[in-house]
């Protein structure tokens, strides 16, 4: 009898799971924000593009500077690539995003977000796996809504 070399699937590290969770949530936010034809509007400049073509899930509070808000839906909204990658640092996209956030959630909530930005938030591998599973289910529902399944 031949012995097979079956590679055991290595468990993902918390960092790998966090990255997957971020990507999954950003996709979900874009899908939820899309109209029935699959188009999203950039919260910073107003450009309209298909949810999966030139639109990203932009973070109001940068994901690298806040573990507290990085995986919260209220912190992520559709942004075109230009605004998300370049405009937040070199243009006025950040100011326009702030105005959007204040109109959407109110100044008090935005101020609380900014105050909480440096708070630590400890998540474990199981937390990430649960979030990913939940968000993937919601993604399926949104894709069905758009007929993109």
Where are these regions (language model features)?
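A boundary/linker detector
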Residues: 1-28, 33, 47-48, 113-149
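Short cysteine-rich loop/turn motifs with clustered Cys
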Residues: 23-56, 80
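Short beta-strand-alpha-helix junction that forms the catalytic/metal-binding core
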Residues: 40, 66-87
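Cys/His-coordinated zinc-binding microdomains
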Residues: 46-47, 61, 84
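Short Cys/His-rich "knuckle" micro-motifs
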Residues: 52-60, 90-94
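Juxtamembrane non-transmembrane "cap" segments at the membrane-aqueous interface
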Residues: 97-98
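Short, surface-exposed acidic
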Residues: 105-115
